[in-house]
Regions:
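Nucleic-acid enzyme cleavage-core boundary/entry regions
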Residues: 1-231
Length: 231
């Protein structure tokens, strides 16, 4: 297990440990989580992204709904613990179906399990990729004058996204944290929604003539594509 995954797991396990300690002390367990409202969204100048502010809401076992939320969170953390220990991964969809074996803790619909993963991201300050949760959709492709280093199952490899790829380009992996930008000669990045337009630009040598990095979004961009573009 990598160092960041160990830190992630340690942070995750603090949640059920806190619930247990509260119950041990005879208290009704609860957890705090950032409130998901427009009023609680702030722009982080350093990272240049929108983040949640300091406003908190409480998930408590005082209500039946709150008790179910804490129970499901404990089951999900147990599942993520096993997944990290075994170096396995799963999709959001798979997590929903796996919960069918959790008895009263199972999710009634996938949006419930999706929101819980989002809750864990907010509480722990780790991304779902660190939990080994991956999206269903494929990443987009990149063509252009940029050299990257990617961590693969067989070690690291360096790829130039013009010289070392075919017309299909370099496919963005699910976890873009495994990519390091080494150098580039690009003047700008252009994101293209449709495959036809992207292919036309490649055929006409647009990336070489204008030193452009062409990113094919494949319609609505996947999470990994959005994260890569932000970098």
């Amino acid at each position: 297990m990598k160092e960041i995954e160990e830190k992630c797991l340690k942070t995750l396990l603090k949640i059920p440990e806190s619930i247990y300690e509260q119950m041990k002390d005879g208290r009704i367990p609860e957890i705090e989580i950032a409130t998901r409202t427009k009023q609680n969204i702030e722009f982080d100048e350093q990272s240049e992204v929108w983040v949640y502010g300091d406003r908190k809401s409480v998930r408590s076992a005082k209500s039946v709904k709150g008790a179910y939320q804490l129970l499901r969170m404990a089951y999900v953390i147990g599942f993520l613990k096993d997944q990290l220990h075994n170096n396995k991964s799963s999709t959001l969809r798979e997590l929903y179906y796996i919960s069918e074996n959790w008895g009263i803790a199972k999710f009634n619909e996938q949006p419930e399990s999706d929101r819980l993963i989002e809750d864990l991201e907010i509480i722990t300050y780790f991304q779902r990729e660190h939990f080994h949760i991956r999206p269903e959709e494929d990443g987009a492709t990149v063509v252009g004058p940029i050299r990257i280093r990617e961590e693969t199952r067989r070690g690291f490899r360096e790829i130039h996204c013009q010289e070392d790829v075919g017309e299909g380009g370099y496919q963005i992996p699910v976890n873009v944290d495994k990519i390091e930008f080494l150098d580039h000669d690009a003047k700008f990045v252009i994101a293209i929604e449709t495959g036809g337009m992207r292919d036309r630009l490649i055929e006409n040598g647009f990336d070489e003539k204008f030193n452009a990095i062409i990113v094919h979004l494949k319609g609505q961009p996947a999470r990994s594509t959005r994260r890569l573009l932000r970098r």
